Amino acid sequence: MEIVHVPVMVKEVLSYFSNLRGVFLDCTVGAGGHSEAILENIKGSVVIGIDVDEEILSVAKQRLKKYESEGRAKLLKATYVEAQRVLSQLGVKAVNGIIMDLGVSTLQLMKGERGFAFSSDGPLDMRMDKTQRLTAYDIVNFWQENQLRRIFFEYGEEKRYAGRIARFIVKNRPVETTAKLVEVIARALPEKERRFRRRHFATRVFQAIRIAVNNELENLRNFLVQVPDILNQNGRIIVISFHSLEDRIVKEAFRSIQELDVLTRKPVRPSLEEVRENPKARSAKMRIAERK
């Protein structure tokens, strides 16, 4: 598979990691962009990269094979909630840097059969981990209307039309493909909502379903409480998020965990130049904390 994924805010990541050495944990290695930058620019660095998506992990393995052969990179299939177990298995007690990029990879979005994108037709899947049972199809076709309304409201921040969209989905079952789901959402929304929203009108619903399928918010909370146990003193954690729900969780966790010093009162945003070159970076927010 051709590598087209461009990692976001690489310069900022390297800047905040510049004084660190030793072992780094890439919790969402994806296509390997941030890991590659760390290995290339931080002398003597070693990266442990984990990702729950085997397909994209194979891309990272290809990209980082030189470093794997040198013993400077170790890539494993795991979710970041399992980070402590993974490090223990590798004989690593703690690391000096942690990077998390919570965005969906371009490679995942490009493959219609993964079901993440509303821009290309495919089955309703949306699983990061293809071995798990719950899919987007299950949620769309079998969850009760009030359950759908709740996730659209809470996870998609679809404040005004969550109930109406849920009602239309239930009424039009079975909904088997991403294209059919987009069609149903379109019918549920007034024309002005479809035409004048800043982002595509299906964005919020797709986000909500993806978060529910992969238990993303709960996993993030469960990981962040582990950070003091796996980060060395003066080590740093960088989290890049792409919507307000994730950013709020990171902000509150960094503030509430006593062992962390927050280095960013407000989130760091990508430069205008980066956004021009890589529009995916537009909504990125980076927060950094340091282990006391």
Curated annotation (Swiss-Prot):
Positions bound to S-adenosyl-L-methionine: 32-34, 51, 87, 101, 108
A Pfam family of this chain: Methyltransf_5
Any one cellular-component term (Gene Ontology): cytoplasm
Keyword rRNA processing in record: yes
Subcellular location(s) per record: Cytoplasm
GO terms (BP aspect): rRNA base methylation
Enzyme Commission number(s): 2.1.1.199
Keywords: Cytoplasm, Methyltransferase, rRNA processing, S-adenosyl-L-methionine, Transferase
Sample GO molecular function, one term: rRNA (cytosine-N4-)-methyltransferase activity
SUPFAM superfamilies: Putative methyltransferase TM0872, insert domain, S-adenosyl-L-methionine-dependent methyltransferases
Top-level taxonomic group: Bacteria
Catalysed reactions listed for this entry: cytidine(1402) in 16S rRNA + S-adenosyl-L-methionine = N(4)-methylcytidine(1402) in 16S rRNA + S-adenosyl-L-homocysteine + H(+)
Cytoplasm found in the keyword field: yes
Gene3D superfamilies: Putative methyltransferase TM0872, insert domain (1.10.150.170), Vaccinia Virus protein VP39 (3.40.50.150)
Family the UniProt entry places it in: Belongs to the methyltransferase superfamily. RsmH family.
PANTHER family to which the protein is assigned, alphabetical: 12S RRNA N4-METHYLCYTIDINE METHYLTRANSFERASE, S-ADENOSYL-METHYLTRANSFERASE MRAW
HAMAP family (UniProt xref): 16SrRNA_methyltr_H (MF_01007)
Function: Specifically methylates the N4 position of cytidine in position 1402 (C1402) of 16S rRNA.
Protein name: Ribosomal RNA small subunit methyltransferase H
The species this protein was found in: Pseudothermotoga lettingae (strain ATCC BAA-301 / DSM 14385 / NBRC 107922 / TMO)
